């Protein structure tokens, strides 16, 4: 990972309702900020197709050159209706965080030191994001913001909510009645399972490159 010594402490997916507009016929064009590091933020764009809610990335920012974070239209696992629905309807509401550090995989909540520790882990390892079940209280969000102004700048100033998460046990079967959504990162894949009953992602598992 020496090619980019400050590769993300976090990658927060921030979909902005102000940045959504109609694109190609039969689609909605969405734009969001990807936080690669405290000093590198890039805008990514995609078309969300009305027919099946499939997502097609438009281009990869030149700022990502050399980081191995590539745009690839073959990323078909992104074509999950519930994720597309979140892009469309939940924008401006949620800053999505995911515990992916090997030393910290497990359950954490709004008062967990693990969640806060994710911001100071090995900066050569990209972190990713996840939609989950429990919104942090206003008090916890405020405390978290004060301790981590980098995340606060990209999330709270837009009135996002931070969310807690749980981890799928290694080797465990995917939860029933769920949709699989794969996030591609520099260190491998993160598989998220979106519960059809609620639309929330409460479990995840990782896979090496």
Curated annotation (Swiss-Prot):
Component of the acid-soluble organic matrix of prismatic shell layers (at protein level). Residues 1-19 form the signal peptide. Keywords: Glycoprotein, Secreted, Signal. One of its GO terms (cellular component) is extracellular region. Glycans are attached at residues 41, 109. It is found in: Secreted. The keyword Glycoprotein applies. It comes from the Eukaryota. This is Uncharacterized protein 6. It comes from Haliotis asinina.
């Amino acid at each position: 990972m020496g090619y980019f010594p400050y590769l993300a402490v976090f990658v927060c997916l921030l979909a902005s309702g102000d940045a959504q507009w109609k694109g190609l016929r039969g689609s909605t064009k969405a734009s969001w900020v990807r936080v690669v590091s405290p000093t590198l933020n890039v805008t990514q764009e995609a078309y969300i197709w009305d027919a099946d809610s499939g997502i097609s990335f438009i281009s990869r920012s030149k700022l990502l050159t050399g980081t191995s974070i590539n745009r690839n239209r073959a990323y078909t696992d992104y074509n999950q209706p519930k994720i597309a629905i979140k892009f469309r309807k939940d924008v401006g509401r949620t800053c999505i965080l995911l515990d992916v550090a090997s030393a910290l995989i497990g359950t954490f909540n709004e008062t967990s030191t693990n969640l806060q520790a994710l911001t100071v882990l090995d900066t050569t390892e990209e972190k990713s994001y996840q939609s989950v079940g429990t919104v942090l209280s206003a008090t916890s969000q405020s405390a978290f913001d004060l301790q981590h102004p980098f995340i606060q700048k990209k999330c709270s100033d837009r009135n996002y909510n931070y969310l807690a998460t749980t981890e799928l046990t290694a080797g465990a079967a995917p939860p029933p009645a769920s949709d699989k959504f794969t996030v591609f990162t520099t260190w491998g894949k993160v598989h998220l399972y979106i519960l059809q009953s609620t639309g929330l992602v409460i479990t995840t598992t990782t896979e090496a490159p």
